[in-house]
Amino acid sequence: GAALHRKDKQVIAFTGDGSIQMNIQDLQTMKHFNLPIKLFVLNNFGYGIIKQFQDTWFDGRYEATGNGYSQPDFGKVAAAYELEYRRIESLDDIKESDLDNADGIFFDVILHPNTLIEPKIDSGNPLHNMFPYLNLPKDAFEKTFIPEEDSDEKR
C-alpha cells in the first residue's frame, strides 16, 4: 500500500522467512505494479519469533519451529515472480546500487537459526510499545506516528 500511495518515496520492507510464506501473494503485487520495493526477508530457517515464545513460556520445548519446519528455495520463489534476488550472508553482500535500483528486489538475509528477533511485542502491550523499550516523552507516539485528519500533504 505504501509503495502505491507514495511512488515518490523509497519503500523498504522487512519480514521473516515464515511470514513471507503467509503473505506470498504480495510478491505478485510487487511484480504486477512494478513496485521498486526492497524486500528484506530475515531468514533464520524457522519461525524465530514463535521459537522465542517457546523459549520464554515453554522452557525451550520446540514444536514445528525447527524440526518439522522447511522452506522453499527463496531464489526460485523470487524467480517465479520474476523479481531480482540477492542472497545476503554478510553486510558486504549488500550493494548501495541495489538500494538505488529502480526495480523491486528480494533480499534473502541469512541469519543464524537462534538469532533473536527484536523489536518484539511483550504480552499485553500495544504494537507501538515493543521491547527494547525506547525512552520517549509520553506524547512522542502521537506526534510522530498518528497523522492529522485530512492532511495528505503532511504525510
Predicted regions and their residues:
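Thiamine diphosphate
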Residues: 1-155
